[in-house]
Amino acid sequence: MRREELLVDNTLSSLVSSHTLSALFLEALLDIDIHCVASKAAIEGDKASILYHCKREPSQNDIDEVLAFIERVTRLHVNALHVSEPARHELRSHVEHLHEARLYFRELVLKTLKPYLAVNREYMLVLLWRGIGVIAEGERDKVHIPGSRYVATAHTHPGSLCLPSGRDLEAAAALLADGGCCTAILAPSCLLLIARRDTLSLDDYDTLLALARHVDKMSFEKLLQKLSMLASTSKTITIQLLSL
């Protein structure tokens, strides 16, 4: 395992609407299918530190690709780079990584998005594959971030329940089918987490899309029943509804 530390200027406030996070920590969302993934990012004051763990020694092209991605996506300018000595790292199974990621993401959503429930508009947390986190402010009843592939997303439902709309379920199906880990909806009374526990099956993908087509016409009780049935029968999706 190789570790790289990137020191970058902090212009994160331009990415989180009118709010500035004094510190944002993203830990241990590891993907065993790519060379380098961010295991920790800390942003304080005018500096940011991002640690990368790699399965093999990165080439100069790998490093250039990572730096270009960070600058393009986050608008952060890299002004220093330090590469440490390789260290031992035992790769665990993909399923174990997904389990760890679900537990971490659930706590991250509660920690970072809960303060925004007091605001009467939706907010979204997006985690990119390189470990960068973005919080975006949406409109009164919706928020949308176009563009890139995400490892995980979450958004708030202020003043309402954490039940998904048809668009929420379509977005969840697309994210999980594209290799993403999990998506969540946070409301004042509950948290809904939809996540992969293995490679998404075609049956589960079709079930999510079928549910998305009809969910807006369902009663509250019917939707809960459908979600519970999917959670109990699926081999590749887990659904958790947590009371707060």
Language-model segments: what does each one mean?
Residues 1-84, 137-244:
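Active-site-proximal loop/helix of nucleotide/amide-processing enzymes and allied scaffolds
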Residues 60-72, 95-101, 125-129:
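Short N-terminal helix-initiation segments at or just after the protein's N-terminus
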Residues 84-115:
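Polybasic, low-complexity association/targeting segments
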Residues 90-97, 122-123, 151-155:
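A generic short-segment signal for beta-strand/edge and adjacent turn/coil regions
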Residues 110-112, 130-145:
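A short, well-structured beta->alpha microelement
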Residues 116-120:
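A short catalytic or substrate-binding loop motif that flags glycine-/basic-rich loops and adjacent residues
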Residues 122-129, 182-186:
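Short beta-strand scaffold segments in enzyme catalytic cores
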